[in-house]
Amino acid sequence: GFPRSGTTLLDTILRSHPMIDVIEEKSSVKKLVNSLSNLSNKSFEKIKVINEENIKEIRTTYFEDLFSYINQEDKQKIYIDKLPLNIVYIGEILRIFPHAKFIISLRHPCDCVLSCFMQNFKLNNSMSNFLNLKDTAVTYDLIMSLLKIYKIKFNFNFFEIKYEKLISNFNDEIKNLLDFLDLPWDNSVLEYHKTADKRDRIFTPSYDQVIKPLYSKS
């Protein structure tokens, strides 16, 4: 999704489920993309002809990097790699993981853009696009336009969840999402605020919001 679209709330809800763990805001996908870029001489077209041996190697390296962030892998769990702007790499991800499932968090564009602009993000290459309102709006439009292209070009497996629907119809939205993940309902997701309390720290700008009751203003 896009920053400030409810991704941290969704992260906390999902990690409350006993069969889910969320690996938050790591660079594993970016490293995957860099590996693909090097092999294809930075040509998106050449990505299509990368051989199976290279794909297996990148896949293995990705998992090694991703699981380095957890204490012990539980093969019974589903692990979600959560970084909102990974949405721009859907094409590359599908080249390595053609059966990947994507959860796309959405929110009304005006709320999303204004919230990003007003947020005091830690500055990096991505967050530098939010230093003024115009650039923030342009960035949002570019990324959502890219998502539309991906939907047209690729027949990939995704689930969209809208922040506004989540807070107004929590149970149904989360049940549908769990169905998408082939997981049963578990009442622990209703107590996501307890999960937030137990976490050492939530490393996103929303850390003080997910422990509160659901609300539409953020």
Indicate residue ranges for each PLM-predicted region:
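PAPS-dependent sulfotransferases, especially Golgi type II membrane carbohydrate sulfotransferases
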Residues: L39, S43-Q76, V113-E160, S168-S218
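Conserved nucleotide-binding/hydrolysis micro-motifs of P-loop NTPases
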Residues: S27-V29, P109-C112, L166-I167
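Conserved beta-strand scaffold positions in the cores of enzyme catalytic domains, especially
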Residues: V22, F102, F158-E160
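Conserved phosphate-donor/acceptor-positioning beta-strand/loop module used by diverse small-molecule
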Residues: E92-M118, L177
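Phosphate-binding active sites in nucleotide-utilizing proteins
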Residues: G1-F97, S105-L106
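Acidic, metal-coordinating catalytic cores used for nucleic-acid/nucleotide bond scission
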Residues: P84-L85, K165-N169
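Glycine-rich loop motifs involved in handling phospho/adenylate chemistry
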Residues: G1-F2, D81, K165, Y192-A196
